[in-house]
Amino acid sequence: MKKVVITGGTRGIGLSMAKEFLKEGCKVTISGRGSRASEELVVELKPYENSYQYVACNVRNISEVEALWEEAAKHWGSIDIWVNNAGQNVPHEFSYNTEASYVDAVIDTNMKGVIYGSQVAAKHMLEQGYGQIWNMEGLGSNDMIQVKTILYGTTKRALTYFTKGLAKELKGTPVMAGLLSPGMVLTDFMTKTPEGETSPVLQNKSFQFIFNNLGDRPETVAAFFIPRILATRKNDAHIVWLTNAKSFLRMMKAPFVKRRLI
């Protein structure tokens, strides 16, 4: 029975992963920025009410990340798996037109939040003698450049570099670091602006075609991730959902197999 912490675990791929871990009998700490778990979250996780806890945490603040570890470890006794999933998107806009507040938010959450989470988890896991740290890739991790998303992509490219470096630093220790590559996932993160409004990118015909053929629902990706996370012992592991081969096959089938997500 593994004990798991997931930052940004209240919705989207984070919540879907939490549910899959719970189905596997794990104990899960879900963190989010709200002071308490939403009613919707409580209802959705009702079948697992004795197997999870919610802890408020702003990953931009390292003292709150440290408190997250302390609370989870106190509640479950130890932590086996730490998933840095919390992320921040930005308006679909050219980088030079993006307000400074959004620049700060995406860097503080996607970069500093992952670094803080990895620092806290690595230190404590080295002390306890075991553990896994997983960081979530995204658009930009593979060097692909898409205009009007380059600020987000920059943070994800940096995250990949950081995680690979962390794995090298942890080489020869009982702690491993790895990457999760979910591909294109249908969540509010993709379909909404930071203010919660419908993203204008959804009206783009080219985006619609690509997403309908290459995108997936979060529960599909989570069901793929969790068994592999639980089975992994290798440092510098890379679990990839949307492989190049899978992408190629889907695009080849596109004229004959209609997939519609948006």
Model regions: which residues?
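The beta1-alpha1 cofactor-binding region of Rossmann-like NAD(H)/NADP(H)-dependent oxidoreductases
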Residues: 56-67, 100
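A short, exposed helix-loop element centered on a Lys and neighboring polar residues
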Residues: 118-119, 164
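Catalytic loop of short-chain dehydrogenase/reductase
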Residues: 132-158, 163-164, 168-171, 184
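Substrate-binding pocket helix/loop in short-chain dehydrogenase/reductase
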Residues: 93-95, 99-107
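C-terminal helical subdomain
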Residues: 179, 198-251
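Conserved glycine-rich Rossmann-like NAD(P)H-binding loop of the short-chain dehydrogenase/reductase
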Residues: 24-41
